[in-house]
Structure formats: C-alpha cells, structure tokens
C-alpha cells in the first residue's frame, strides 16, 4: 500500500481544480512514511483519491502533483510521454521561428513540477529544482537518453532553491561531451554565444526571445541604452534593427566580453556598440546629472523579489529604476521595461511604471505588452507559471 497524504477537510478544492501544489497548511496527516521526494498518493479527508505527487517534508509546498490520473505510475514511460507531448509544441515553434534552442520542459506547465530542461543545439541542460524531481532523476535521464540520443546532457542544478528542500547543489556532465566554453545558437536570424557551464540559469534567457525580436521595430536610427545587458541579446537585436548606437550596461565584465563577441559573431558594426561595466542604478543617475539622452531604453533587471516579505522593497526598486529611465528618454522615446519576478503581477508592475512616470514628471503611453516566449507556456490551472511581463511605453 502506498504512502498517503491526507488533506484537511475543505482543502481539496485546489486539487479538484487541478492546481499542482499542496501546501503544508492543507495537510491533516501522513499515513505511512515517505522519504524526501518519494511519490505518494494524495487523498481528501474521507480517503477519496485526488492525485499522485512528490513529497517534501520540509518545504512549504508539501507535495507537488505528478498526475491526476489514478492509473498513471511515475516511471520512465511517464517521463517519456511528458517529453513527447512537450516536444510536439517545440517542434512547431522551432520551425516557425527558425530556432535550434528552446525550453523543452517548463516545470508545472509541462506536467513535470520542479523540472526545467533547455535545449541549446545538441545539448540538453537540466535543472532539478524540487525534491520530487531529484528523486526521479534516473528515470528522467533514461527517458531523455532514449528520445534524444544525439544530445549530450548537462546538469545545472546549482540553484539555491534546492537547499530549501534539503538538497545539495549539483553541476556537471551527465552524458556525452562537455559543453564548449561558448556554444553558438540561433534565434530569429541572429547568432548568440551561450555559456552553459558558467552562465546565468541554464546559460541564457530563452524566455526573452520574442521581446528581443520586438525591439528591432523601435530602434531604426535611434540611440539605445541596454540596461542589465548580460551577454547582449538585446544589443545584437538593436543593431540588427538599424540603431545608430547601443550602450550595454552590466556589472559583469565576462558577460560584456561575450556581448562584444556576439556583435562580432553577427558581423555587425562594432563601432556602434559600447559596453559599460557599472551599476545600472548609479550609472542612470550619473547620465541624468550629465544630461545624457536616449531614444530607446531596454530595462531588463534580474529578479528583485524572492518572497512576499521582499515585495515592498522590490516595488520601490522597480519604480526608481523606471523613473530614472523615463527621465533619460527624449520626447517620443520608447521604454521597454520588464519584470521577471513571479510575485510581481502584471497589473502591479504596470502601476509601478505609471507611478514612475508621475515621479519623473512625464506622460507615458502603454503601447505594447510582453510576456515570456511561447516555449515557456502557462497551463491554465497554474497561473503562477506566468512570471515574465513587460511593456513598451512611449514617453511624451
């Protein structure tokens, strides 16, 4: 008999709506003992079966649902089916957009909670972010090897969130060859170097692909400021769009060096690209005090908020940085501003940008809205999957 997690009366409603999380406060008791990440059955207070998920005794999210099908077991065949379902959509996207790299598995939205898999050319980069995902590591890797024999698999589970569930950070080659220091990939007609071993996240921000493409329409003959530039995806896109100059700002010299190489890789005019190692907040104030002006500003900061207790401070940060950007824009200029913080709702982010415009003494029109690229889908029963939001704003 399998271990059962019994819910408190009335706490089954979210599972009946097929939300994939069970929080600790919803648990009445455990029947049997389960190890970290082990698959358990989830039942209501009367013993009615609801779902099958992974158990994490120390996490606020006490269980993450693998399946709502009582007849489905969590094994190699399960992961093979999930991967095949996900691949069908990515095949269509890759053909439509000319991609050789994409997010293959987007966690809960692809029915694999705690699992992130990005494909960069013939490398699969794996992140196992939950105890259940780690527990199923062998089955998942076996399914990947069967479906993708041409691909090497590299583990980037070196993410601090693993510590919250009592797991160590891991990184290294799983199967196949070691990724090169810089791997070239393609998106929307441009080539970009990706650092799988040492780069942010899995090596690159695939979720901003469509936003990078959208940037091109705003930059013809314009002076562009690219804040938090990382390895220069927005800068390359701006140059491909015909900008007169793009200034990329980041605190990492290594990232800026790769950004320069990305400009050269695409045979673009390097004289139109400037790379500045500096703190964005400080530099924006310096530019403001010096009277610098730009026609387009890309504001793509890292996550400012990890938990609800940080939300107030994050709001101040987002408002301040957007206020500074608005002050630096010429009349009619375009601000492309983003938030990747899941706790920051789209409505709240829009309000913060509007408040920033008031503080800057400028009128702003919202002219376009952005979200994560389509290889980062959001399943209807898990709205938390929508984490990236952005706006194109015309500053009067």
Swiss-Prot record:
Coiled coil: none annotated. The keyword S-adenosyl-L-methionine applies. InterPro entries: PUA (IPR002478), PUA-like_sf (IPR015947), PUA_sf (IPR036974), RLMI (IPR023542), RlmI-like_PUA (IPR041532), SAM-dep_methyl-trfase (IPR019614), SAM-dependent_MTases_sf (IPR029063). It is an enzyme of class 2 (transferase). GO terms for molecular function: RNA binding; rRNA (cytosine) methyltransferase activity. SUPFAM superfamilies: PUA domain-like, S-adenosyl-L-methionine-dependent methyltransferases. It is found in: Cytoplasm. It catalyses: cytidine(1962) in 23S rRNA + S-adenosyl-L-methionine = 5-methylcytidine(1962) in 23S rRNA + S-adenosyl-L-homocysteine + H(+). Keywords: Cytoplasm, Methyltransferase, RNA-binding, rRNA processing, S-adenosyl-L-methionine, Transferase. HAMAP family: 23SrRNA_methyltr_I. NCBIfam families: PRK15128.1 (NF011707). Specifically methylates the cytosine at position 1962 (m5C1962) of 23S rRNA. This is Ribosomal RNA large subunit methyltransferase I. It comes from Enterobacter sp. (strain 638). The gene is rlmI.
């Amino acid at each position: 008999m399998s271990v059962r997690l019994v819910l408190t009366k009335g706490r089954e409603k979210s599972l009946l709506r097929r939300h994939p999380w069970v929080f600790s406060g919803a648990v009445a008791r455990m029947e049997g003992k389960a190890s970290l990440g082990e698959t358990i059955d989830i039942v209501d207070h009367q013993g009615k079966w609801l779902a099958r998920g992974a158990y994490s005794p120390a996490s606020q999210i006490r269980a993450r649902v693998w399946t709502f099908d009582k007849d489905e077991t969590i094994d190699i065949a399960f992961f093979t089916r999930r991967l095949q379902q996900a691949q069908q959509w990515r095949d269509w996207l890759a053909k439509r957009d000319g991609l050789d790299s994409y997010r293959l598995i987007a966690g809960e939205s692809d029915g694999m909670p705690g699992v992130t898999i990005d494909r960069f050319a013939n490398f699969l980069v794996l992140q196992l972010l939950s105890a259940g995902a780690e527990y199923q590591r062998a089955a998942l890797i076996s399914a990947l090897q069967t479906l993708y024999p041409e691909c090497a698999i590299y583990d980037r589970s070196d993410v601090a969130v693993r510590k919250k569930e009592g797991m160590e950070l891991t990184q290294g080659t799983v199967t196949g060859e070691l990724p090169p220091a810089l791997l070239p990939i393609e998106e929307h007609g441009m080539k970009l170097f990706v650092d799988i071993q040492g780069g942010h996240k899995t090596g690159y921000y695939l979720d901003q692909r469509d936003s990078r493409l959208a940037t091109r329409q705003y930059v013809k003959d314009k002076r562009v400021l690219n804040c938090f530039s990382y390895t220069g995806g927005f800068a390359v896109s701006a140059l491909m769009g015909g900008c007169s100059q793009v200034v990329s700002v980041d605190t990492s010299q290594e990232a800026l060096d790769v950004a320069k190489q990305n400009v050269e890789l695409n045979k673009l005019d390097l004289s139109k690209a400037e790379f500045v190692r500096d703190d964005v907040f400080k530099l924006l104030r310096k530019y403001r005090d010096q009277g610098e002006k730009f026609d387009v500003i890309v504001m793509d900061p890292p996550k400012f908020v990890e938990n609800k207790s940080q939300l107030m401070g994050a709001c101040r940060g987002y408002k301040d940085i957007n206020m500074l950007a608005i002050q630096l824009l010429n009349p009619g200029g375009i601000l492309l501003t983003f938030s990747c913080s899941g706790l920051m709702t789209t409505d709240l982010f829009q309000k913060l940008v509007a408040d920033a415009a008031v503080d800057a003494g400028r009128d702003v029109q919202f002219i376009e809205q952005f979200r994560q690229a389509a290889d980062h889908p959001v399943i209807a029963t898990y709205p938390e999957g929508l984490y990236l939001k952005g706006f194109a704003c015309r500053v009067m």
